[in-house]
Amino acid sequence: MAESIERMLPNDINAEAAVLSAMMIDNNSVAKVLELVRENHFYKNSHKVIFRAISDLFERNIEVDIITLIHRLEEKSELEKIGGKLYIN
C-alpha cells in the first residue's frame, strides 16, 4: 500500500522577514527585490500581505517606511490580520 507523504515546501520565515525589513528600511532595495521576488515566493501569509502592501506603495511612488506601510495596511483592513503594529515593528 502506497503511503501519502506530505512534504512542506522549503521555507525560511526569518529570511522572509529580513527581505521585508530591508524593503522597509532602504527604498532602493524595493525595486531590486521586486525584480526577483513575487508574492507567491513567501510562505507565511502575513508576509505575503506585507509584500503586497509594499509593492502597492512602490507602484504608487509612495516612499516605503513603517508609517506608510502601517497606514496602507489599515486602509485595506489588513493590519490586524498580520498581527498588528507590533508585528511590523
PLM-predicted stretches and their roles:
Residues 1-89:
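Noncatalytic partner-interaction/assembly domains of nucleic-acid and motor enzyme complexes
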